[in-house]
Amino acid sequence: MGKKSSKLKQDTIDRLTTDTYFTEKEIRQWHKGFLKDCPNGLLTEQGFIKIYKQFFPQGDPSKFASLVFRVFDENNDGSIEFEEFIRALSVTSKGNLDEKLQWAFRLYDVDNDGYITREEMYNIVDAIYQMVGQQPQSEDENTPQKRVDKIFDQMDKNHDGKLTLEEFREGSKADPRIVQALSLGGG
């Protein structure tokens, strides 16, 4: 991606209109806003956390924002270029349920081994609880560990202590509240 330019090239726009759910006009608008917030064309992890803090002032979104940042940063170079940003935004804001669940699975599967372990699930659920601050939950979900236990009871069909993409997808579709919780962090 080399040197960052403030002008969006037509081939980049064409690629993004093909690869995302955004129109050329929307892409140009998002690019303008992106450059306003990130004049050098790169969004750092600290900048990303700062954005989340604006939306979740009552909690601490730092941990969750860092985890989401990792999924946005497709090439793992420590910053988010506009193309990475718009592709992730397309899925999280306009994608269909399967695309959103695939994206969420990548978020939860921190080590990218194709499974979500209890520890990985706990990591995300704990980050979400920190982000939203204290909100009343039912007795069986009032701690991150209880929430993880409940999710695994529902989703881990073969009881091997880890979730495959298929188990995650089916379990999420069977429980609309899980999908609602996912959209909390998905954008």
UniProtKB/Swiss-Prot annotation:
Top-rank lineage group of the source organism: Eukaryota
One of the protein's GO biological processes: neuromuscular junction development
Keywords, alphabetical: Calcium, Cytoplasm, Lipoprotein, Metal-binding, Myristate, Repeat
MF term (GO), any: calcium sensitive guanylate cyclase activator activity
Tissue: Enriched in synapses, such as the motor nerve endings at neuromuscular junctions. In the embryo, highly expressed in the ventral ganglia.
Example of a GO cellular component annotation carried by this entry: cytoplasm
One family name in Pfam for this protein: EF-hand_7
Phenotype of the disrupted gene, per the record: Increased number of type Is boutons in neuromuscular junctions of abdominal segment 3 muscle fibers and reduced nerve-evoked excitatory junction potential.
Note: Binds 3 calcium ions via the second, third and fourth EF-hands.
Protein name per Swiss-Prot or TrEMBL: Frequenin-1
Species assigned in the record: Drosophila melanogaster (Fruit fly)
